């Protein structure tokens, strides 16, 4: 029997062998504070590739040193960082998967000794530092940093780029009226609040012609914040600019209580897919092969992003295949251990 979860998916000239994506998750393991890849990253991402993930997306990688969440984040702000990232893509490719990178700037959530930057001088909460409102010059410099990061991503061998526009980081801060109180062309109307992301996408398109994803927080979980319906217009604009897929997460732009349950964010992937007519990825408490297969069969999303479940078990695709009764092609090195893998957690 054929299963959609294990069917190929082609975006532009990149074909994924299945619909399983390793969701980007910060590892805080660049131990020297220099943004460099370490042996941990090679093992961490290479193992998921060997585990038969279709697309391995590495963690939020800072386009500027001041755009890190912590000083242990990976970086792509300098050419000296390309070599380590290229080793990572080589590990991933050699083990049968495609490689993606998430380009990010932490904005007001940067927990560094340097000043945090944001569209407006509003802290995330009472315990975090007051950010500095970005000047137009700083905005232009950041747009350029995303473009340069895209150039380096190509040099490092990545197949896919994702722009991190979610979880209360810099781009999300510009998009949301809760965090963007600017009175210039970067604030006010939805069109103005989208301008920063528009300029980033345009700048990346000048140097990158591969698949381009954007991760969004499709719900601010606040009465005065953005909802998934607001993101329909945003994602229509993204599609017009050539974005290929929307990775649909939610929350974290402001402190909020979120009702979390299995597949709680799938509704956002479905809504964006239906109303913006663009491919989507579903993410959030997707933990079984049957659940993932159902999402795809219901046409609620095109790709399945797996996060914590891949931390618990790097071989999740094999477990999902066993669960569904699908015979997954094994790496030849593991052919002496056919059959079921324990699903005990």
Swiss-Prot record:
Single GO BP term: response to toxic substance
InterPro entries listed in its UniProt record: Aldolase_TIM, NADPH_DH_bac, OxRdtase_FMN_N, YqjM-like
Keyword Flavoprotein applies: yes
Binding-site list for substrate: 28, 164-167
CDD domains per the UniProt record, alphabetical: OYE_YqiM_FMN
UniProt keyword list: Detoxification, Flavoprotein, FMN, NADP, Oxidoreductase
Reaction catalysed by this enzyme: A + NADPH + H(+) = AH2 + NADP(+)
E.C. number: 1.6.99.1
Required cofactor(s): FMN
GO molecular function, one term: NADP binding
Sites where the protein binds FMN: 23-26, 60, 102, 215, 307-308
Biological role: Catalyzes the reduction of the double bond of an array of alpha,beta-unsaturated aldehydes and ketones. It also reduces the nitro group of nitroester and nitroaromatic compounds. It could have a role in detoxification processes.
HAMAP family in alphabetical order: NamA (MF_01614)
Similarity comment: Belongs to the NADH:flavin oxidoreductase/NADH oxidase family. NamA subfamily.
NCBIfam families: PRK13523.1
Protein name: NADPH dehydrogenase
Name of the gene encoding the protein in the UniProt record: namA
